[in-house]
Amino acid sequence: MNRPASASVMPTAIRTVAGGVTTSPAGLLLAAGAGRRMGTPKALVDDWLVRGVDVLAAAGCSPVVVVLGAALQKARALLQGRAVIMAAAADWSDGLSAPLRTGIDALPAGAPAAVVTLVDLPDVGERVVRRVLEYGARPATLTRATYHGRPGHPVVLGRAHWPGIIAAANGDVGARAYLARQVPALVECADLASGRDIDWPEEAISVGVWHA
């Protein structure tokens, strides 16, 4: 049953039990874009890629899947030695939906849910991910962070939603069309972060998240 956007839900534990085995939500970091406005792929900006992986892992996500595309070899090199699953989106230039589909396909079948976030959210930290996960990480979970009421990331996608998201993801809309129909539970996180995606070098430098 869909929840209205204003629904409140009671926190639950991050870990869930499936078939008698304690499992964790997977992390899914989308980092495939060319970053045309930034002038470089965002996966290569400062420590954003490594930080995104570390945030998900520190919040209890395992495994962490990273979807790469532009500057593939350079981005892979930044993650050498880290316990991540790297997935290459061959069609990354088609828009956000292509890396999202690639990432969902790379998720382990036994994961109850995936925590999806973007590489260009450098002030979204571990506490934000943990807060959103407090509201569940089960196969039916559909939860999204908001910032002063504005929907953002991370988004917790329960496994039951993955086929529908893949089917609905086209162009640059990602999971937007699916989330508009299903209406996730919303978790306010503006006291922890801005949730602002950084698109321009001047923005990154002005807020201290790129040391050019």
Where are these regions (language model features)?
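Short beta-strand and adjoining strand-loop segment in the mid-core
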Residues: R101-G103, W162-I165
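Nucleotide phosphate-binding site architecture
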Residues: G35, V45, W162-P163, I205
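Nucleotide and nucleotide-moiety/phosphate-recognizing core
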Residues: G20-P151, R181-C189
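Conserved nucleotide-sugar donor-binding
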Residues: R150-G164, P201
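A short acidic, helix-capping loop that chelates divalent metal ions and anchors anionic groups
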Residues: R36-T40, G164-I165, G195
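Conserved alpha/beta core of the MobA/IspD/sugar-nucleotide pyrophosphorylase nucleotidyltransferase superfamily
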Residues: R3-P4, V9-T23, A167-A212
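Amphipathic alpha-helical interaction/coupling elements
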Residues: R131, A160, A177-Y178
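Short aromatic/basic micro-patch
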Residues: D123, V156, D197
